[in-house]
Amino acid sequence: MDLQSLGKLAKEASYELAITGSEKKNAALEAIALALEANQDKIVSANKEDIQAGKEAGLTEALLDRLLLDETRLAGVVSDVRSVIKLDDPVGEEFDGKLLENGLKLSKRRVPIGVIGVIYEARPNVTIDIAVLSLKTGNACILRGGKETIRSNIVLVEVIQAALKSVGLPETSVQYIKSTDRALVGELLKMDDYVDMIIPRGNAGLQKFCKENSNIPVIVGGIGVCHLFADKSVDQEKALAIVANAKVQRPTVCNALETLLVHQDIAEEFLPKLHAHLAPMGVTLIAEEKAKAILGDKATLAEAGDFDREWLCLNLGVKVVADFHEAIMHIRTHSSGHSDGILTNDFTIANKFINVVNSAAVYINASTRFTDGSQFGLGAEVAVSTQKLHARGPMGLQELTTYKWIGIGENLIRP
Amino acid sequence: MDLQSLGKLAKEASYELAITGSEKKNAALEAIALALEANQDKIVSANKEDIQAGKEAGLTEALLDRLLLDETRLAGVVSDVRSVIKLDDPVGEEFDGKLLENGLKLSKRRVPIGVIGVIYEARPNVTIDIAVLSLKTGNACILRGGKETIRSNIVLVEVIQAALKSVGLPETSVQYIKSTDRALVGELLKMDDYVDMIIPRGNAGLQKFCKENSNIPVIVGGIGVCHLFADKSVDQEKALAIVANAKVQRPTVCNALETLLVHQDIAEEFLPKLHAHLAPMGVTLIAEEKAKAILGDKATLAEAGDFDREWLCLNLGVKVVADFHEAIMHIRTHSSGHSDGILTNDFTIANKFINVVNSAAVYINASTRFTDGSQFGLGAEVAVSTQKLHARGPMGLQELTTYKWIGIGENLIRP
């Protein structure tokens, strides 16, 4: 596996993609959609081998389900590709244009970033997602999926490359690191001559590894330790519905709720209601001491570190706070900066909350589950960024672009 | 030097700055301006000690001049502070606001980044610049200047801190790493719990060190290997003026010209003119073989690596290219992505150039010297970014901010 020459080829492909118009890029995406349909049997059969190997390796049912790419799911993926075709291409937009006093006609033009390296786990549909969103925005990409789906991914990338070739675009626009050697991830992170951005889509360990070992800018994200604060003025019935939605709808995703902070003035009344509402849904309350004192054996006492965990299951941390200030201090200390919200009917407190809390998404009286590219109307989602530079929160097509300044003069020198 | 507690204090200060209004931030800047005036003697005297130590250490006259902060220069710095007061505060702006079909009122709000770490060299005015631009945008900062100006910098930061205290803002909003121990830079780069962005302002070695050792996003920049391509259709007289401006006006800065590419059809005629125009200004032409063959002993033959160097002096690389394509290939290989331009009267070629070249700033018939915050009308400049994420080219106040998504619902759950 010669990663350097793979990087060089990706960079060269990126130069061609950068000057490819929307029509041709969309033709490439349609060719990919058709090729995925035409190669359905090959893809599904490679996936079956992955599933079989996963079973032999003793993977859990939940993980095996994430690996699965059957006919139905593949049809869904193809339909997603066609949705991306319909989205506007952000590349080429000019903005902040002005004629300066010094005579320079200046503007910013939106351009592709170049080469995007994506390291991800498990789900093979990510392979198609990332390839398609990168191509739509004129970026080349280098993909590195998990070892559990390597057979599926290799076939998928072959199909994509053949489709690219059929429309006259470089096959090297989408490349896959076919070895499961972990050292290659470390090598990829050092290839700043060829790769412009790294997106790790995976657990906290992968995020940390990329942050600490990359010479290339890394979009850290997808780790959600999310909070809701039920203020004393909250409409308790509505709060129960929002908390249930945030916790139960899809507990394994990053915008699911980890911790509910409850104002002490309502804790005695609200916490038993909370338990009555959530217990039938399978939720276990993990309570700090004050909440535990109220809930008794309806809750498990929280251990050290519990309030820093992304649960990814039906556990819910519960903590009684003395006031707004204590709620803010808790969020500041424990939030991963993904999504945090307040449930309140007090206008002043609500405003204060959105002024003070600095997470990628801050909510008043809404579920944290809204932090999502499609919910936000972005049409697509590459990742959810929890860092502060370049992009925050759900990243759509625009976040796969950068800009360049264009200055036009009539033979202009600086005075 | 306990860098961890310094970082913690900066983070805490950043929370307060983030909710401080423009009026109070401007009052702090005016207090700083007044304090710099009131402490002029103390500052100038500390700077004299730095200059004396520099002389004893055998620093060059050019470097000693960069260290100098006398009464006149300090007055200039104070005047710059008052200019920043007059600029609009980007913090708090809301944009991309929309009411989504799912009922969520969504917008992005511009907010401070948090804590900015800046590592810089030589010039003590950078201490004031960075502190003032950070405060204006509600960011705390941790500064680490060069050892040559440590006495000046310590006094400047003391003056700033006293001014902050006088208006009731945390002194820890601006902190200085008072030790010259190089290991502390490495430690700062790992403090991702407290620092949100690193800006290295210095030579290529510092930039590389930060990129390779930081867990925190780094804004790489300020290294300019800049090109102009004189196409065959160029107005030669005007081209001479632009090339002279780009090379000679201020050869030690990053937007100065490194390399002139000349179309072979005009090389025989243009290169001797170029020499006649630039030689009296002290420029030495460093030519590749074809250009050397034309220029003879009017040029020095380029050595390996010369076309990758940022000259920072009156040398100018000169290369004859066969056509547009060869010019582009040279720029792709050797440009640092700072500023590159074409000199031409051919509309099609000009357009092709700005489409194909992906540098932070791309010019048609204008000097590379325009790549500058004040020339671009940004009012201020924190750094010139040559990387592609977050900000490209001159970074003004807005580039010291990020955004958060604000979602407001009437007790809204995700369907």
Swiss-Prot record, chains A, B:
Enzyme class comes to: oxidoreductase
Q: What keywords are assigned to this protein?
A: Amino-acid biosynthesis, Cytoplasm, NADP, Oxidoreductase, Proline biosynthesis
InterPro entries given in the database record? Ald_DH/histidinol_DH, Ald_DH_C, Ald_DH_N, Aldehyde_DH_dom, G-glutamylP_reductase_CS, Glu-5-SA_DH, GPR_dom
Checking CDD domains in the record gives: ALDH_F18-19_ProA-GPR
What is the reaction catalyzed?
L-glutamate 5-semialdehyde + phosphate + NADP(+) = L-glutamyl 5-phosphate + NADPH + H(+)
Gene Ontology, cellular component aspect: cytoplasm
Give the protein family: Belongs to the gamma-glutamyl phosphate reductase family.
| Name of the protein in question | Gamma-glutamyl phosphate reductase
What species is given as this protein's source?
A: Psychromonas ingrahamii (strain DSM 17664 / CCUG 51855 / 37)
